[in-house]
Amino acid sequence: MPKKKYAEIYRRLKTKIETGEYEFQEMLPSENQLILTYDCSRNTIRRAISALVMDGYVQTMQGKGVRNIFRPALQTSFTIGGIESFKESALRNHQTPKTQVLCFTEIIADEKIANRTGFPAGSQLYYIQRLHYLDGKALILNHNYFLKNIAVNLTKEIAEGSIYEYLENELHISIVTSKRVMTVEKMTEIDEKYLQLGDYNCLAVVSSQTFNSDGVMFEYTQSRHRPDFFRFQDNAVRRKC
C-alpha cells in the first residue's frame, strides 16, 4: 500500500508540473504542506519527491525546499524519457495516440537476428512492425521483437493497444531496465513508404534492449522517428569521486 501511495503522489505532482500548475523555477509546496494535502507520512512524500528528482522534474535545495526545473516541450515535438509504452509517452506529451500493426508474426532468431537484437540464436520470438500516429501524423515506425515464453499469448489486437499494459497487468511482469542506443541513420524504403519524410533522407533511431525483474531480456525494439518531431530528454547528475 505505501508503494502505491507514494507512486500516486508522484503522478499527481508530475501532472501538476507538466500542465504548468507549478511553473518553471517555482518552488513546490513545503514538505509539511504536502503531508497535509495528501494525508500521508513524511517518508512517503520524500519518496515521491526523490522519484521526481530522478526523472528530472525537480531539484531539492537544502534549507529552501524543492524547485520545479521542468520546462514543457513544444507540442510539435515528441519527447521520450523513461521506460514507457507508446501510449504512456503520447499521453505525457499531451497528444492523441493511434497504432497500426503492419506485421505480426512468429519467428525463430537466426544468427543475423541474434547479432542485431542480442537474443540467442534459436530463440522463439514475436516480430511486430507497428506504425505509431500522434495527433493523426505517422511519426514512429517500430520494429519489435518479444520473447514468446515471456510475452505469452501476445496477439495483434494487444499490439494495437499497449503491449506493456498487457505484460504488466495481465502477465504481472515487472519491467525494470532498458539499455538504449540512439543513432542517426539513412532512411529505408519502408521508412519512406510510411513516415512521409518529405525532404529528409535520414531519421532518428532508438534501439533498446529491455529486461524484466529476473534480469531476462524479453524485448528488443528499434524505433525509427521522423527527425522533425523527435526530442530526447534525459536527466544527468554529476558525481564527484
Name every feature range the model reports, one short phrase each.
Residues M54-G63, I69:
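Beta-hairpin "wing" of winged helix-turn-helix
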Residues I49-S50:
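Short, hydrophobic-biased segments on the C-terminal half of alpha helices
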Residues T96-C241:
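C-terminal all-alpha effector/ligand-binding and dimerization domain
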